[in-house]
Amino acid sequence: MDPYRNRPSSGFNTPFWTTNSGAPVWNNNSSLTVGSRGPILLEDYHLIEKLANFDRERIPERVVHARGASAKGFFEVTHDVSHLTCADFLRAPGVQTPVIVRFSTVIHERGSPETLRDPRGFAVKFYTREGNFDLVGNNFPVFFIRDGMKFPDVVHAFKPNPKSHLQENWRIFDFLSHVPESLHMLTFLLDDLGIPQDYRHMEGSGVNTYTLINKAGKVHYVKFHWKPTCGVKCLLENEAIKVGGSNHSHATQDLYDSISAGNYPEWKLYIQIMDPAHEDKFDFDPLDVTKTWPEDILPLQPVGRLVLNKNIDNFFAENEQLAFCPGIVVPGVSYSEDKLLQTRIFSYSDTQRHRLGPNYLQLPVNAPKCAHHNNHHEGFMNFMHRDEEVNYFPSRCDPARNAESFPVPSAICSGKREKCVIEKENNFKQPGERYRSWAPDRQERFLNRLVGGLSDPRITHELRTIWISYWIQCDKSLGQKLATRLNVKPSI
């Protein structure tokens, strides 16, 4: 009998209960005891196995993006981009690729309400013929920090106080006062966009700058953007309290119910393209993740559409065990020197190995749907059937060879080894422009949220003065209004 033929699956369920090893269980209601009221016997293997499995049901929670919901569907190319990339799944209009998508909140725990003011994750796994491609982004196009060295710190600042386990504004504004590049992100988080109505009415962004490479080896910087066909809708504070008070899983339920009813969510994928030769023409660094690219100069170009038409079959197997990593790319798509992207490439795969084990890419939801071959073997929870005698490379006894080469970025890097900030920080221009683009009532709501955060009694006069000086440099009127509301005299 082939032990690998019938892998564990509900498709092989028996009509009666069994142990994990397949032995029949004739009583799944009572423990084995000495007499009807006697002590339980240690030899009750089924009881021990049942309890031991129960005790180990929970796996480590994601350090960020713990609260999430997933759905499956397809991505279809609608516009020709073969002049920009040799990626097989983007080779021509009409090509469809199966996908799974996970939406999430970022900071709060696995069971937290989906109505909290928080960025939202928007991660897409493409199961292409050349391997998986993970586009791991958020609903906002920018982030709080530009260098991954600060990533643990920004997460710690937003997470609950380690002493009281309460999320506190003084900790957030204390840390962010040291990273003024965060101001642009705050104009998204404290804006009306800060609480999406649900996942279907939410934009997505790749956030980081990637590269596309065509067959000739020409490289372009690229930004990815998802636009929902049903529009963007958000909740104001009073609406969020009402919705969250009646259903703390409202966004998950909305996604699940919409797909079940045949009302399939859809997003259009757009890209912005920049020639690396032109990167010095801007007053910001195009690889700075705290900046957006101006759409009037670098317009959005349509690529395809994402349709989610199938709910997941099991929440644990296809949401909790679903794992993404920005390092998982395919030929025709690669990385840039974006400092945050460079650190995410390591951190994401490392946290998956911690949560799920070294063989997490063997889990069905994470495994590629195309043929694949390497000598990465053994380790905890390895369930791949292998019968090779050669587990090294190269070998004259094994016909496996290197794959055909494909174009990769080949820019020459030069410079001295140093730890430093980028030359073009320009932290205040874009947040100021964004604030001035809003209607007066929207500006007022943003100001109220800012005042509320900076009114935390543990925020010092010095800290408020720093924040006022920052916002004055973004927009003088905004900074002066903030100073008046906080009863603080501006220092500049």
Curated annotation (Swiss-Prot):
Residues at the catalytic site: 65, 138
Listed GO biological process terms: hydrogen peroxide catabolic process; response to oxidative stress
One Pfam family named in its UniProt record: Catalase
EC number, as in UniProt: 1.11.1.6
Subcellular location: Cytoplasm, Cytosol; Peroxisome matrix
Top class in the EC scheme: oxidoreductase
Tissue expression from the record: Abundant in endosperms and cotyledons. Only in small amount in root.
Record-level Gene Ontology MF annotations: catalase activity; heme binding; metal ion binding
Keywords: Cytoplasm, Heme, Hydrogen peroxide, Iron, Metal-binding, Oxidoreductase, Peroxidase, Peroxisome
Keyword Manganese attached: no
Residues binding heme: 348
Co-factor(s): heme
Catalysed reactions listed for this entry: 2 H2O2 = O2 + 2 H2O
CC annotations in GO: cytosol; peroxisomal matrix
Keyword Signal appears in the UniProt entry: no
Assembly and oligomerization: Homotetramer.
Similarity comment: family membership: Belongs to the catalase family.
Function: Catalyzes the degradation of hydrogen peroxide (H(2)O(2)) generated by peroxisomal oxidases to water and oxygen, thereby protecting cells from the toxic effects of hydrogen peroxide.
Name assigned to this protein: Catalase isozyme 1
Organism: Ricinus communis (Castor bean)
Name of the gene this protein is made from: CAT1
